[in-house]
Amino acid sequence: MKKEDYLPNLVDIESPLSDEELYVLSQQYNNEGDFVSVQTRFNYAWGLIKSRKVEDQQLGVQILAQVYKDTPSRRRECLYYLAIGSYKLGEYTDARKYCDLLLQIEPDDPQSAKLRQIIEDKLAKEGMIGIAIVGGVIAVGAAVLGAVLSQKKR
């Protein structure tokens, strides 16, 4: 298997599982009870992260974080999906942190580099929106202050 085939395309992440598919993963997870296998936990977390529901995505990130801690052999995959899950939740700083850890493991991985760029682009966009909002608030405040001061002069 080539390195670039190891992780899915980023476009695939945006296509959620059907309710039926997620239900199958959920049932497998619940049926294993107290002894849920690493693969089942990973699969369920993966399905949850692909969900459109924020609660599902949050649970997916929590499960993956535990798999990451418990199973060193799955860390690379976990980091990738932790980055994606955090990105989808709007937690861009965490997403970048996970992606950076992944790139430390495999600095030449094109999918991880692409994911890192997507995260950086989103952070830059969010930063520009924040600057625009602050600028707008300052402009409105200055206009109000100017109006108040001009009223006092009359």
Swiss-Prot record:
InterPro entries from the UniProt entry: Fis1, Fis1_cytosol, Fis1_TPR_C, Fis1_TPR_N, TPR-like_helical_dom_sf
Pfam families: Fis1_TPR_C, Fis1_TPR_N
Localization of this protein: Mitochondrion outer membrane
A GO CC term assigned to this protein in UniProt: peroxisomal membrane
Membrane-traversing stretches: 129-149
Domain of life from the UniProt record: Eukaryota
Membrane topology summary: Single-pass membrane protein
Topological region Cytoplasmic: 1-128
GO molecular function: lipid binding; molecular adaptor activity
GO biological process: mitochondrial fission; peroxisome fission
TPR repeats, residue ranges: 76-109
Domain observations: The C-terminus is required for mitochondrial localization, while the N-terminus is necessary for mitochondrial fission.
Family stated for the protein in its record: Belongs to the FIS1 family.
Cited PANTHER family: MITOCHONDRIAL FISSION 1 PROTEIN, TETRATRICOPEPTIDE REPEAT PROTEIN 11 TPR REPEAT PROTEIN 11
Name of this protein: Mitochondrial fission 1 protein
